[in-house]
């Protein structure tokens, strides 16, 4: 069943918007000030440990850790996971554009800046350079 290019782009935009929502939704959990001393217990800072952590977090425009610790990394894992999902979507988009640029389909093409050629052997051809770059960078 055929689908228009506009429909494909709408699906991409919808998926990218969900990634933006995910990134915004995890900000308070991900960007936390990790302060706790050698063992992560704030013991070396005594009774003012939590207060110092809160002050440091405010200065860095971050949230303080709810439970200071050195061995937690779930906040970083969450961030990397969301970025991985975003990279996967970008790779998918680049791959689809790459395929749609093939001569068999010819549905889309990348613009070629004035004064340059699209291909070293066939000047009329448009190589999917940007689409390839997106796939490579997202990998």
Language model features: what each stretch is:
Residues 3-139:
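Internal glycine-rich alpha/beta core junctions
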């Amino acid at each position: 069943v055929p689908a228009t290019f506009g429909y494909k782009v709408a699906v991409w935009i919808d998926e990218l918007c969900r990634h933006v929502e995910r990134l915004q939704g995890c900000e308070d959990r991900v960007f936390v000030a990790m302060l706790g001393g050698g063992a992560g217990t704030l013991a070396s800072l005594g009774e003012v440990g939590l207060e110092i952590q809160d002050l440091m977090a405010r200065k860095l425009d971050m949230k303080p850790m709810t439970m200071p610790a050195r061995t937690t990394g779930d906040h970083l894992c969450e961030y990397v996971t969301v970025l991985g999902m975003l990279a996967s979507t970008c790779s998918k988009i680049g791959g689809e554009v790459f395929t749609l640029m093939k001569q068999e389909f010819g549905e889309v093409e990348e613009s070629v800046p004035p004064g340059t050629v699209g291909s070293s052997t066939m000047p009329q051809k448009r190589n999917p350079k940007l689409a390839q770059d997106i796939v490579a960078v997202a990998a």
